[in-house]
């Protein structure tokens, strides 16, 4: 008999295997290891979910099902379906199984007869098939061709095409095939196949048909599974397709829509699986993706709360079985629900024992914490141990016949592994527990223990300022909401061809060709691929090829009749449609590293791309390691004075400063608040005797004492010897701050300090009076290179120069634009490091990608070569606090600092003289009662005097003696750096090279990399004194304080700080010479003298901590060519820099050393001189090529033409007189110079060559009147010519004759300040000026260029634990990492133990005179006498003994600071004090470090238009603009000064005869005129806009006037033509200005593709441009034209809207209105213009942001519906929302969850441009107390 026991899910901690019997059972039941029987879902593989052509969704086997809201899902297949796939996809890693099951739930069309599924081999032979219809056929043919077609198993008497649902299971086991129909009928047939049959998996699987078959399956199908286990067919109705009335059991089935419902006991152990054909009722639209692992399935498809999720590896238990299991009225066995697909069978082999699945897989360890109940049997019966009969035993029974029986009469021996008819039918499902399918291998894992309690709050961290303790990286945050899509970037370059995709599905079979006459054999060009190796990826043959092969083979099989004549070639059928993409193959193994490619030639220079929009700032990276200290850079520009910083921590004590003069006594401060009572102080010294007090009341009469003898007053005793040194007392509390001690004696004059750094340059002072001209100075050293000037006028194209010598390798280019950011990929295996590839071209800037996780920090790179000294950088951001620097030289004594905090108690100073009596302090707290002291001597009774008035305070005591010299203070802070060193000695003279032609100034080179640490330079000479600074502004007047009590006059204070300089006074009269003064005290240290000779090298100091990188210096001198270094790794592509302005030409450089000989160039024939070319666009720098090998010196080449002007060289020694350089651009106007001395008269020059005709001369003196000419016609008014290009300056003329002095002109008005002239050559050194005052802090320099890319950022926070990955192969051991950077100092450690007592101190000084000794023994008390009369006051008695400590007095004056005491041990932290009053507002602190970038804030309202900004500084000279239209003729100018006489003209030919004029009055005969020049009368040259015709040269014999008129007329015509040409050009290519608007932004982009995004003027309706309006052009998005909502339409702040009704339009709100739109200047856009803009646009786009608090904007995630979605009213009065407009989508839908503050961003991107912009919005989800919303309306953008 079976004894059933069960495993109960143990409580945590309960032992699971408590009996040895269970262990024995586990050992007996251990199954043999077997491969997992993983069902393969053919419908999933054929992509039924995406409904391919001919497939639709329909209701499945069950219209309703218990515990499920939705019906089963099935697929209706029509004749149009063409579905096939390579068999390899079904079994990618293995062969087709010998024994298997085919399971399907199907409803075939009534009366049909077609194959449901067919499997073909590589040659196109059908190997497997299932035909549905009357008498179904199971077709099977193995690799040996067995069984033949006549032996295929046939199942007569069964009709599967009756139009009803059937559950069909076919089990193929050895040489039997069993059909189980509808869980009732079982028919077994003999299958005469070979002993080891093979089904080829290199062919294809067709669904619903056979190749060349006319019959195609039509009907509905819900499931079609292949299982690699023949026993799965017997479980079909329990595990895969249960009955409709079967409730969803406790089994962890994949269909469970709500896993919580099946655990009434609340254990919360849930499994999550997917089932592909039953829709999740909570999300009907979801199509779950298959997954290979149950754990991953749960993670990928559903979010399950943490407490409920459990990995599905715990063993579920067995279903309930009973005797009724096989009855026809209850075909479902047990309470099984829908069967899972891949997920469920991932690790589950079938066992060869009964339903008790309680034994682990031998590979798995046992986990005693399993939470499942497993029924076990204590008896090992034949039911659970006998294997199925072998085929030999069953052969005679089965034979060729088949047995037909119902399931209840199953052969027990055959079926008993699955069915136990003797099982206890009384076992209830609750006892058995959650069911476990028979095919689930059990893996026991622990149930999680109960959640621990929250731990106690940790101690607060001790983090000091500037200390950064890096925590462990946090868990990865949840994925952020997807950002709104960026604007469309420019089209990228064509990518590399992708890998070949998987083969598509086979196409439709072609139509039959017409039968042709006999002909040649057709050879189809198929590539028959041989079988790949095991593990090769994907099928070797495409699906189309397999299908064609199958067609051929099928045709061959069909032609089994007598051979007919050979047919002609038939027409090929049409190509079927491409199949859908197959599943992507697994990633291939990494191939071996390929050989390094040859360096490609540099590509052609691309056109410069448009400048991308600036990306948003990245997160701030961690500061990199401090680089080595660089060379001292040139002084940068002075920064603006920063805001006042926080008060720094008190620095270490500086050396004692020079004693200052006594300051004046300050006003008395206000009385401070009363302090807390202090602890009782130590016993004070005996105070001076106070004034006699008032008489007290008579005391109580005491007891009479025994009369004692009255002793005489003894003489005062001598002071005793000094006592021994006592032990040091306990450390006292810190005393109060002592008073400032008297100034010490003046110390000896210290050594002059090191010269300080030159101060920041002050602003230029006012110009001084002009001094007398100095004597001519000697040739000064060449000055520093001046700033790069504005570009001069474009020069004439120079002739080609000599070919230059080969240059050294260029510096690294700047980074390119960042590319598109990709999604974060899966972390791949660590590959081998490949060789660096060649640098690619710069890609266009992509839109900003989603922020990826921070990468791991990279390894430190090797130190680069020392770079050249760069240009001075601009001030960078403040760095993080660096490590403590090394101790610098002692600085100068600083100014008196503010009062420091209380110091540690000093050692006691020498005793000062007694000060005056202080006023009586307030009463202190009661002290501790002291021990009774010894009795003092009785004093004489003094009479009580009347209380005297309080006397005045005594005078201040004399100043104490100066104290001893204090110990040396700690070293001061680092001094300022020294002045720049002198120029080094001149290097060795190089070989004199041939003089190179002067070159053109090149653009500024890229910034060099940080060089290694240079040697410290020598200190430079002191700079010139700065000019007088401007006076500062006066401070605000403070509030008047309360008058304090009158103080005593103090000693003179130290001199105050130097005041600001006053306004410059008028010059006073010259005073008389004074008397010689006496010798003054030694002055302050003078300016540093010139450096002495270099001393011997000192010992090498320790390597200092690396300093912060200094500012970028200017370019240093070019170093000699270095040895080629090892090739570094490929750097990142640099960004194209903006072209800098062309600098002014520098002076001619020194003769350079001869370069290396270059290759010989071939001698070309000289070309003709070309005309001047247009200015080309600046191309981006090409990639730097590799350094070539040094060539052999070639033969000397022929002299080439002079090259272009070279770059400005460094200043060398003065060379010989160079050849004349190019004329420089005109400099700014200089100051008026003094008149020069008259020059000597020069010699008469030679007669020059004939020059070109000069400009018209001035009007000459009147000649003798000529004969009257004829009357000419009146001339027309000509247009002025266009402005000519500026000619090059002529050679200097000879000095003119000195003119007579003119009269003194009137005083001119004060002129505006002229522009700064260029730097003059360095003058001779002037006399040493007085040291100037420190100027105010300079203005801040301009913002610096972006720095080099920072080091990699700190590792980002760790992400959430991802799904466990597969274990990777062991990696190769990594290289030894470079040592990490030095860690920052940790927090202060705990106080150390108290040290041993120190050595005995030095012997003390001799003590002062001791107090009076103690009295003698006490005598007996005498009786109290009567009170006598008040006597006269007696003499003051001797000092009594020290009394009891008196009350605490007021705080005395601060004592002088003692020397530093040793630091005491660290005390325990005190209790927190009471909260103090809030202090005054502190000064503004230093700007903090730049924080991490916060999340983007909500869009703010558009601000009001700001006030006009201050006048900006004049910008650089712009590029030459388009020539403007001719202006109107100006008024005639005044006659010019007479010019010099021109050269004699050449003889001209006689002009044409003019018309005869009227006879004039006869005049005097004049002298004959000079012959004139012939000038072309018609300057018809369309390209010239400047006329070289001089009207004075046209006058010849009075007949030239007609020519003048004619020429002037032509000039007017040409001016008009030029204007027309400009206007036509602007019409063709509008500029987007108000006078020349474009039609749309798209038009503007087409004409000017290089324009940046911004505001431009458009005029969509064209015509007059006065109605144009200004829009925002988004060229990055392809040329969108954007208009904005007006200020009141931009949106509304988030609020609860209590008075508004949900479902009403915003325009009906009290604060609402219809939305209206304006242009970029705030003017409304006209309706007509908007209409034309829409006509010119193909699509329109607008974003709306809904800011919510627990309010839905679009989808309601709780219900999955869009009932509460916002509705919009378009410009065409059309309502738009989710239900009627597919062009609205949610870019971000944070409001769907109704959790806290969120936002939803909706985008309308519609081709119906008349809908945009929206004019009204309807909101529906608000009104409850906890709901709020606001919204923001974005611009409407139209794209043409």
UniProtKB/Swiss-Prot annotation:
Location of the Fibrillar collagen NC1 domain: 1611-1839
GO biological process entries: blood vessel development; cell adhesion; cell migration; collagen biosynthetic process; collagen fibril organization; eye morphogenesis; heart morphogenesis; integrin biosynthetic process
Amino acid composition bias (Gly residues), ranges on this chain: 1296-1305
UniProt superkingdom: Eukaryota
Domain Laminin G-like: 72-244
Family per similarity comment: Belongs to the fibrillar collagen family.
Protein name as catalogued: Collagen alpha-1(V) chain
